[in-house]
Protein backbone atom coordinates (compact mmCIF):
# COMPACT_ATOMS: atom_id res chain seq x y z
CA UNK A 1 0.00 0.00 0.00
CA UNK A 2 1.49 3.30 -1.07
CA UNK A 3 0.57 6.48 0.78
CA UNK A 4 0.22 9.81 -0.98
CA UNK A 5 1.79 13.02 0.31
CA UNK A 6 -1.64 14.37 1.22
CA UNK A 7 -2.37 11.27 3.32
CA UNK A 8 0.89 11.66 5.24
CA UNK A 9 0.07 15.31 5.90
CA UNK A 10 -3.40 14.32 7.09
CA UNK A 11 -1.99 11.66 9.43
CA UNK A 12 0.51 14.18 10.81
CA UNK A 13 -2.30 16.67 11.36
CA UNK A 14 -4.42 14.09 13.20
CA UNK A 15 -1.42 13.14 15.37
CA UNK A 16 -0.69 16.83 15.98
CA UNK A 17 2.87 16.29 14.73
CA UNK A 18 4.75 18.90 12.73
CA UNK A 19 6.80 17.43 9.89
CA UNK A 20 9.06 19.13 7.39
CA UNK A 21 8.06 19.00 3.72
CA UNK A 22 11.32 17.31 2.70
CA UNK A 23 10.72 14.52 5.28
CA UNK A 24 7.30 13.56 3.88
CA UNK A 25 8.58 11.06 1.26
CA UNK A 26 10.54 9.19 3.95
CA UNK A 27 7.53 9.08 6.25
CA UNK A 28 5.38 7.89 3.36
CA UNK A 29 7.80 5.03 2.67
CA UNK A 30 8.01 4.04 6.34
CA UNK A 31 4.25 4.16 6.87
CA UNK A 32 3.66 2.23 3.64
CA UNK A 33 6.10 -0.47 4.80
CA UNK A 34 4.27 -0.74 8.13
CA UNK A 35 0.89 -1.01 6.41
CA UNK A 36 2.26 -3.66 4.02
CA UNK A 37 3.52 -5.65 7.00
CA UNK A 38 0.09 -5.43 8.65
CA UNK A 39 -1.48 -6.71 5.42
CA UNK A 40 0.94 -9.68 5.46
CA UNK A 41 -0.02 -10.45 9.05
CA UNK A 42 -3.73 -10.33 8.14
CA UNK A 43 -3.12 -13.08 5.56
CA UNK A 44 -1.68 -15.52 8.13
CA UNK A 45 -3.98 -18.40 9.11
CA UNK A 46 -4.35 -18.28 12.90
CA UNK A 47 -7.36 -20.58 13.18
CA UNK A 48 -5.38 -23.19 15.18
CA UNK A 49 -3.75 -20.69 17.52
CA UNK A 50 -5.22 -20.22 20.97
CA UNK A 51 -5.80 -16.55 21.77
CA UNK A 52 -3.77 -15.24 24.68
CA UNK A 53 -3.48 -12.06 26.68
CA UNK A 54 0.27 -12.37 27.26
CA UNK A 55 2.95 -14.42 25.47
CA UNK A 56 4.38 -15.76 28.74
CA UNK A 57 2.22 -18.04 30.85
CA UNK A 58 3.37 -16.53 34.14
CA UNK A 59 1.43 -16.17 37.35
CA UNK A 60 2.03 -13.09 39.44
CA UNK A 61 2.86 -13.79 43.03
CA UNK A 62 0.94 -11.13 44.90
CA UNK A 63 1.29 -10.51 48.59
CA UNK A 64 -1.67 -10.17 50.91
CA UNK A 65 -2.72 -6.61 51.68
CA UNK A 66 -1.74 -5.57 55.16
CA UNK A 67 -1.91 -2.29 57.04
CA UNK A 68 1.61 -0.95 57.52
CA UNK A 69 0.82 2.53 58.84
CA UNK A 70 -1.76 3.78 61.33
CA UNK A 71 -4.84 5.58 60.01
CA UNK A 72 -4.14 9.30 60.49
CA UNK A 73 -7.00 10.62 58.41
CA UNK A 74 -8.72 12.43 61.27
CA UNK A 75 -5.44 14.07 62.30
CA UNK A 76 -4.77 15.30 58.76
CA UNK A 77 -8.36 16.51 58.37
CA UNK A 78 -8.03 18.48 61.61
CA UNK A 79 -4.93 20.38 60.45
CA UNK A 80 -6.08 20.98 56.87
CA UNK A 81 -6.95 24.60 56.00
CA UNK A 82 -10.38 23.64 54.61
CA UNK A 83 -12.39 20.41 54.50
CA UNK A 84 -15.95 19.49 53.68
CA UNK A 85 -17.63 16.09 54.11
CA UNK A 86 -14.25 14.45 54.60
CA UNK A 87 -12.74 16.01 51.47
CA UNK A 88 -9.94 18.56 51.25
CA UNK A 89 -10.97 21.86 49.69
CA UNK A 90 -8.37 23.47 47.44
CA UNK A 91 -8.34 26.71 45.45
CA UNK A 92 -9.90 26.53 41.98
CA UNK A 93 -7.22 26.34 39.28
CA UNK A 94 -9.45 26.00 36.21
CA UNK A 95 -12.09 28.60 35.55
Curated annotation (Swiss-Prot):
Name this protein carries in UniProt: Aspartyl/glutamyl-tRNA(Asn/Gln) amidotransferase subunit C
Role according to the record: Allows the formation of correctly charged Asn-tRNA(Asn) or Gln-tRNA(Gln) through the transamidation of misacylated Asp-tRNA(Asn) or Glu-tRNA(Gln) in organisms which lack either or both of asparaginyl-tRNA or glutaminyl-tRNA synthetases. The reaction takes place in the presence of glutamine and ATP through an activated phospho-Asp-tRNA(Asn) or phospho-Glu-tRNA(Gln).
PANTHER family listed in its UniProt record: GLUTAMYL-TRNA(GLN) AMIDOTRANSFERASE SUBUNIT C, MITOCHONDRIAL (PTHR15004:SF0)
Any one Gene Ontology BP term: regulation of translational fidelity
A Pfam cross-reference name: GatC
GO MF, one example: asparaginyl-tRNA synthase (glutamine-hydrolyzing) activity
Species the sequence originates in: Alkalilimnicola ehrlichii (strain ATCC BAA-1101 / DSM 17681 / MLHE-1)
Keywords: ATP-binding, Ligase, Nucleotide-binding, Protein biosynthesis
Source domain of life: Bacteria
Catalytic activity reported: L-glutamyl-tRNA(Gln) + L-glutamine + ATP + H2O = L-glutaminyl-tRNA(Gln) + L-glutamate + ADP + phosphate + H(+); L-aspartyl-tRNA(Asn) + L-glutamine + ATP + H2O = L-asparaginyl-tRNA(Asn) + L-glutamate + ADP + phosphate + 2 H(+)
Signal sequence coordinates: none
Subunit structure, interactors included: Heterotrimer of A, B and C subunits.
Amino acid sequence: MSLEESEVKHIAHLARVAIEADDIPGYARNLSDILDFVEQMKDIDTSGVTPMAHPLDAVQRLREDEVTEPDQRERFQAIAPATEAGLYLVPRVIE
